[in-house]
Regions:
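Single-residue recognition of alpha-helix boundary sites
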Residues: 14, 88-89, 174-176
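Active-site segments that bind and position negatively charged phosphate/pyrophosphate groups
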Residues: 32-140
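A glycine/threonine-rich phosphate-anchoring loop and its flanking beta-alpha core
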Residues: 1-40, 162-163
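Short, function-defining helix-loop hinge/capping sites that tune catalysis or transport
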Residues: 11, 86, 170-171
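Glycine-rich, flexible loop/turn motifs
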Residues: 6, 56, 70, 160, ...
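C-terminal charged capping/lid subdomain of soluble metabolic enzymes
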Residues: 20-23, 117-185
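Glycine-rich, charged/polar anion/phosphate-binding loops
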Residues: 7, 59, 145
Length: 185
């Protein structure tokens, strides 16, 4: 049982921060959920958003308990997101910065291959109040990304979204992360 009314106790920024994972689910597998983010009343439809997001995650985890197959999709946005979070995230004594969901939201954008879909996602972020960009030291973020659990032997598996509702895991050299951060070769 999930009681959406408890969300009213959260500051608005935390509420929106949590929605980033639901936006992720919509991009990976649920175009109808994405439509809610584009045009729906988020607060009125929060029960549906929660239901659809949990249904997606439950389905993935039940099919792949060990993260060797489709469960990898849940890492979408997290490779870059965790790098940003390590450098700019709210943690420990650092009380100013970005929350986890905000970092993941930023990490999803470069992994969306369709420019048209990127534009739509940016519009959703604006609508929700998620960040579209943030200033950060790219070298530090890149260095943090090299410590990602998916980085092994100079390779890293990233999740890319070529279009709404579809994704693929792609193993690339870790140097391939640099252009995703907008770094020069």
């Amino acid at each position: 049982f999930v009681d959406p009314s408890t969300l009213a106790t959260l500051p608005r920024r935390q509420y929106i921060n949590g929605l980033a994972e639901s936006v992720k689910a919509s991009l990976l597998a649920d175009p109808e959920l994405f439509a809610i983010f584009e045009k729906g009343d988020i607060d009125e439809q929060i029960g549906e958003i929660i239901y659809r997001s949990l249904r997606f995650k439950k389905s993935i985890v039940e099919q792949d308990e060990t993260e060797h197959g489709m469960r990898k999709a849940l890492n979408f946005g997290h490779t870059i997101g965790h790098g940003i979070e390590a450098v700019k995230g709210v943690k420990g004594r650092r009380t100013v910065g970005l929350y986890h969901g905000e970092c993941v939201a930023l990490g999803m954008l470069p992994m969306i291959e369709s420019k048209a879909l990127q534009k739509r996602v940016r519009a959703v972020y604006r609508r929700l109040g998620l960040p579209l960009r943030t200033a950060y030291n790219k070298d530090k973020v890149y260095a943090e990304m090299l410590h990602d659990k998916k980085a092994q032997g100079g390779q890293i598996t990233v999740i890319k979204v070529p279009g709404l509702g579809c994704w693929r895991a792609e193993t690339i050299p870790v140097e391939g992360l640099r252009p995703l951060l907008g770094m020069e070769d």
